[in-house]
Amino acid sequence: MRNEITGGSPSLSRAWFALAVLALAAILGITDRQMLTLAVEPLKRDLQLSDTSLGAIVGFGPILFGALASPLLGWLTDRVDRRWLLVACVLVWSAGTALCGLVTQGWMLFLCTLTLAVGEAGLGPVVYSMLPDLFPPALRTAANTIFFAVALFGAGLGIAGAGAIFSVAAPLAHALSIEPWRLAFLLVAIPGPVVAGLFALVGHPPRGGTADQHERAQETLAHYWRRSGAMLACLIVGYAMAAFYVGAILGWAPVSLIRDFHVDVARSGLYSGIAVGGGSALGLLASVVAVRCLRARWGRLLPVVIGCAMALLAALLLLMLSFATSTAMLLACMIGIIAAYIAGAALTPTLLQDIAPPHLRGRVVGTSSLVTYAFQAMSVPSVGAISDALDGAPYALLKGIVWLGVPAAVFSVILLGLVLRTFRTRFEPHCEVGAQAL
């Protein structure tokens, strides 16, 4: 199923259909995950959990478990029919979401969130391994950008949709004599089997790649790591540090709206959705403008340059979050931080695809996911622990985000700065990243 560039090609039509279903799966996964964030307060009340326990159950545990599962799922991605692997992942995380609505103990919720996390961990390796084989080189970066953009805007839609589901569930739950959050989890799990069925219709493309990648077709993972590992490690950890402070924002800012600014659950979901969607749009636009204006100057270094600059901007915005005493100011800082992160991360998928041979692509993406998940896993419970230690102090959650987020952003700047210094001699990608993108 090698693609041609003709728009009327049946294989290309199937590729666009596959991209649409992959994007839909990403939106569904985000919605399921954000449902946990918006349900924090009723879960805390009904299951009698502390912020630290909630951080471990909703954040640390599932994210860490997903991180550990990512390399295995990346290995499977490189060896099995990626179509059926994704179908299995969607069904697994949908089952975990539905079971969250049936729990009565904290440990039961923990097991359900682990199930959800394992299913979602397979999405990244499958998508970023499959897109280069679905689309010809001339359309690959465009396909990556479209999926990245849809997933970004889907994050806003996901959290807003989760809030809307809570609103719909409330009157129905009253009629059924159950807690609204339980019904909300059951409702949000319904689309999962439908999306899985749609993707089952997609054919499995043969694994391909560029001429340079074919020359390295027999390269082992160990040899690849010896050749490119040092700078790859700096790059992955640098972006993971950015994911750390963004994870803290996404995990606790909606809760802070409810707890510190007395916003109800539905409006918290709506406001947070607007902030995530608006920040995503601004970040993607900033990335497009930067590519068009700076590509000639920086060439293949551009993704790292943008990432370094945006991490520095995020550090300044996190400092401003210390002074947020109104809903509007919190949302403004949230929009800016998310925009800075997105602008830096927009070209990362294409960069990883360019530096990885086709037969190792799933494992490279899986390794990147493992590191990113690990840092995200630490962000949510760490902020929760600071909140508990402050014992009811005003804006305790925001203080935790700032105290941990600023050092993370600074460390991201340092690591990406190291990449800039040695990129040309120790970490050579095989095409100009961003030259065709956007």
Q: Where are the language model's segments positioned?
A:
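Juxtamembrane intracellular "pre-TM" segments in multi-pass secondary transporters
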Residues: 4-12, 204-234, 260
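Extracytoplasmic gate region of multi-pass secondary transporters
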Residues: 36-37, 228-284, 345, 349, ...
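Extracellular/periplasmic helix-loop-helix junction of adjacent transmembrane segments
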Residues: 39-68
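Central cavity-lining transmembrane alpha-helices of secondary-active solute carriers
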Residues: 57-73, 274-287
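Conserved MFS/SLC helix-loop-helix module at the cytosolic interface between two early adjacent transmembrane helices
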Residues: 67-106
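C-terminal ends and interior cores of transmembrane alpha-helices
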Residues: 91-104, 311-325
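Cytoplasmic helix-loop-helix junction between adjacent transmembrane helices
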Residues: 112-151
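Helix-loop-helix hairpin linking two adjacent transmembrane segments in secondary transporters
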Residues: 147-201
